[in-house]
Amino acid sequence: MDKLFLLDAYALIYRSYYAFIKNPRINSKGMNTSAIMGFCNTLHEVMTKEKPTHLGVAFDPHGPTFRNEAYEQYKAQREETPEDIRAAVPIIKDILGAMHIPVLEVAGYEADDVIGTLAKKAGEMGLDTYMLTPDKDYGQLVGGNVKMFRPRHGGGYETLDEEGVKEKYGIDSPLQVIDLLGLMGDSADNIPGCPGVGEKTAVKLINQFGGITALLQRTDELKGALKKKVEENKEQIEFSKFLATIKTDVPIELNLDELKVKEPDEERIIEIFNDLEFKTFIQRFLNKPKPQQKSVSNQLDLFADIPDDGKETIKNGASQSLKTMVHKYELVDKEEDIKKLCDFLITNDFVSFDTETTSTNAIDAELVGLSFSVKEKEAYYVPVSSNREEAEKIVNIFKPLYENEEILKIGQNMKYDIEVLANYGVEVRGKMFDTMIAHYLIQPETRHNMDDMAESYLDYKTIRIEELIGPKGKGQKSMRDLQPSEVYEYAAEDADITLQLKNKLEPELKKRGAYDLFCNIEMPLMPVLAEMEMNGVRIDTQSLKETSRTLTERMHEIEQRIHELAGMEFNIASPKQVGEVLFEKMKIVEKAKKTKTGQYVTNEEVLQSLKGKHEIVADILEHRGLKKLLGTYVDALPKLINPRTGRIHTSFNQTVTATGRLSSSDPNLQNIPVRGEDGKEIRKAFVPEPGCEFFSADYSQIELRVMAHLSGDENMIEAFREGHDIHAATAAKIYKESIDEVSRDQRTKAKRANFGIIYGITVFGLAERLEISRDEAKQLIEGYFENFPKVKEYMDKSIQMARANGYAETLFHRRRYLADINSHNATVRGFAERNAINAPIQGTAADIIKVAMINVYRRFRKEGVKSKMILQVHDELNFSVLPEEKEKVEKIVLEEMQNALKMQVPLVADSGWGKNWLEAH
């Protein structure tokens, strides 16, 4: 039976684009392909599952339509089309052309009207017709053979026939969808509707009167406020009905021969998808056969190959899963077979492995099982007993495998597995390949979990952990609660899919020039971070108690002062109440900024700008700062001490920041305040191991030194080589003074300029930061570039290269992809341009300290140092040091930090010793 599908292009493109908004699909050229990928997925799913005989895709035309001409505000509220969508549309049209699918577009009419006209004609011919769109206004067209095919939230589609539309919207006829939208309006299209009438009221009115026409004739039957609303907005309601009505008389013919589904232009499809880097789409759209995907019994011989039954099937979208994939996953639970498995695995050059445990916290996690894979679609799972002695016996069987330095270890988030195995006396050694970190280097600003990567690279839907242990919450089980027979396929799949991902990601790393960075920095850093996390850091809880008491008393004093200044008591923690006190009662400014909901804006930025208006503002800011310190650090840190180890174990993250810097979490120790007496009190609470001293080493002005090297500016290089105070030297150049004559104020301004200008700060931004006039800020920036001309050249060149390549790159070839670098939107483009300047500097500095950490770790091991590296905070390394190793540790750390990279200027690290972090730094 013939079946016609009509697709609303822009509705689907927008939906696809925003579905990926938090995890955009960026290819190696820096192009955002989210809209194209989502649209192609929808198109392919429709073609393969619904099997239409006829297909057309309708687009809105360039320029205004009859609705715009009738109502200037029509769709005016809709934000400007994102540039990535504008760039995607011609490519989508190219794909449709290569598929021989007609693009339906009529000047002056929207896609709705084109589809409405064609659907009506097709329905009258008796052709089953489906309108694919998420937009509810299409409901008015449904009837007879014409149906809506609507994407559901969360996946899948719903088909709405006449009864379905009536039931969904609570109306008596699909045509009443027009009345529904005419009354309730449509914010997306800026159809005004009747003010104060929502969907429920609109449905009630339609059921009472039958539609807008009768309603407006019988308004005397209405009462109260509703009557007033309707009568005062009669013209607007009628006009809204006009705007909501889809035309069915557009000048376009229904050409079934043209709409008939045809064979695609294979060569063109391959060319387009290769250019987009949609490798799996080539297979999917061209219907290339693949081997039948079939499960293999886990009773096969332990190391037998997967049998080939000669059958073929076609992979469909992301529907590939364990149920449809040929695989051989083995549950290995007998000691004799476990030993055989280890003997077999150890003969391979590589092994993909994973651990199943009782906790996501590696420090406390107990092993539940081990999984391994050395061949795609084959994997093995070994359950581990809850009895510690029995567990160690199983783990020790695999110890020679894990500790074999000749075997490449492959994993996903391997740092976790390294720490778990270390708790059982096993050290994972040799070269490593972590798929999470590999993907981070390829697409740093997206998510790197295995489930997402499997769908993106393998077109495969993994078993979700929630399917085994249930959703997060009190009722969630532990892996220990399940039988090995319930776990083994999930666990084996992890090892197998990780191996498959490695085979996809490795060539991609090489293609993008990131393989050396991956092998020589990110992978060697992983065991360093694992050891630091296991080391943990001790906290002086008594010191924090005293700090808490002092800060709480001070906060209460400030609170009383704020209430006195305000002349009333109010909740200082409530932004709403703060706004009302400052701007209504005290009227500290004539016109205060408000949110869309009418609430006063009282964030830090606003309050900082108002500090000079009244002393209460500074007190409110101080009160907020103290409250945050207490809640985030002073009172929170003692609760995070692990009861078993007596230490805090933060997590150091390699895959979070786009620049390459490490971050830390649970707790975030990177954000502990550096300035101010209160921040110092927190640092005082970080102490070394008993009997040890705290040692801290910090790079001096590393980002400015990197800038000097990258720009090659002779004046900046000279200042660093001669060991001058760079900020005083900068001030001397700008203000044309002798370096000895530079004032404290001049040095401060030069320091702010140094760190601001190299990151593209504007005249306005510098004026705000230094609290000086824009003229003075302008002169300061001009003076800076006059004295450091190659810095300006470097900044301009960085932007040009980013525009040409779509990314910025560090000295170690770490890339930051900048999708908006060529945007027509000046604000968006400006942000990307600042990142083009910033990324190579900040990223290179981040890579330098990573190299230093790796080399310090190796020297400690080689020279038998027992002292521990415990913290990394931006450009600073911290250690707990045995007294007898003080001289040795200081020598190693400073040597490795200062020789991590040879540049045109020296790398300098300052260091200090103390009883705690504060004293040492």
Label each region the model flagged.
Residues 477-480, 527, 534, 642-645, ...:
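Conserved catalytic core of nucleic-acid polymerases
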Residues 233-385, 412, 445, 453, ...:
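Conserved "right-hand" nucleotidyltransferase catalytic core of DNA-directed polymerases
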Residues 73-87, 143-171, 227-229, 380-397, ...:
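Short alpha-helix plus adjacent loop in nuclease-associated cores
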Residues 509-521, 525, 848-873, 877:
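Active-site palm subdomain of RNA-directed nucleic acid polymerases
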Residues 553, 557-560, 564-618, 786-838, ...:
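C-terminal polymerase-core module
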Residues 185-208, 274-277, 540:
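Helix-hairpin-helix
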Residues 4-5, 15-54, 72-73, 77-84, ...:
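Conserved RNase H-like, two-metal-ion catalytic cores of nucleic-acid enzymes
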Residues 1-132, 136-163, 236-239, 245-253, ...:
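Noncatalytic, basic helical substrate-engagement surface that gates or grips nucleic-acid strands
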